Amino acid sequence: MALPKDMRLKGHRTFNYIHKNSIKYHGKLMTFKVARSNPEILLSHNHTNASNNFRAAIAISKKVSKKAVDRNKIRRILQEWLITNIPKINSHKPYWLLVNLKFGDFCNDKNKLLEEFQNLMFKSRLIK
């Protein structure tokens, strides 16, 4: 299941803002870039609710897997975790999150991937 529209990041200005103004958290399998939300950037995308809600994007390089099926499977796993855990915990946090997966073969190890993802969420203080 994909992220709801009000939780998605989109547009090159948004990603440029995150790359310039983010705090980076590194793990073995992925890196997090967390930045304070800036709703003015989203106004150019005609968002009716350009609020300070938590938003996220997951970027998976072809270096992780050449097959789009595997990359989409990983993306769906992480998005499902976000959908089930973030609204319950704190959807009011005004942060934007960009998740970049590092090079490696971990398509078959869902538990290791989710454990690393959850550890970085705690480390970045997006969840408590």
From Swiss-Prot:
What InterPro entries does the database record attribute to this sequence? Ribosomal_Su5_D2-typ_SF (IPR020568), Ribsml_uS5_D2-typ_fold_subgr (IPR014721), RNase_P (IPR000100)
Query: Does the UniProt entry include the keyword Nucleotide-binding?
Result: no
Recorded GO molecular functions are: 3'-tRNA processing endoribonuclease activity; ribonuclease P activity; tRNA binding
Q: Name one GO biological process term.
A: tRNA 5'-leader removal
Which keywords appear in this protein's UniProt record, sorted alphabetically? Endonuclease, Hydrolase, Nuclease, RNA-binding, tRNA processing
**EC number of the protein:** 3.1.26.5
Q: Which domain of life is it from?
A: Bacteria
**Gene Ontology annotations for the cellular component aspect, listed alphabetically:** ribonuclease P complex
Catalytic activity, as annotated: Endonucleolytic cleavage of RNA, removing 5'-extranucleotides from tRNA precursor
Which pairs are disulfide-linked? none
The UniProt entry, under Pfam families, shows:
Ribonuclease_P (PF00825)
Similarity-based family = Belongs to the RnpA family.
Q: Which PANTHER family match?
A: RIBONUCLEASE P PROTEIN COMPONENT
Subunit record text? Consists of a catalytic RNA component (M1 or rnpB) and a protein subunit.
What role is this protein assigned? RNaseP catalyzes the removal of the 5'-leader sequence from pre-tRNA to produce the mature 5'-terminus. It can also cleave other RNA substrates such as 4.5S RNA. The protein component plays an auxiliary but essential role in vivo by binding to the 5'-leader sequence and broadening the substrate specificity of the ribozyme.
Q: What is this protein called?
A: Ribonuclease P protein component
Originating organism: Prochlorococcus marinus (strain MIT 9312)
Gene designation per UniProt: rnpA
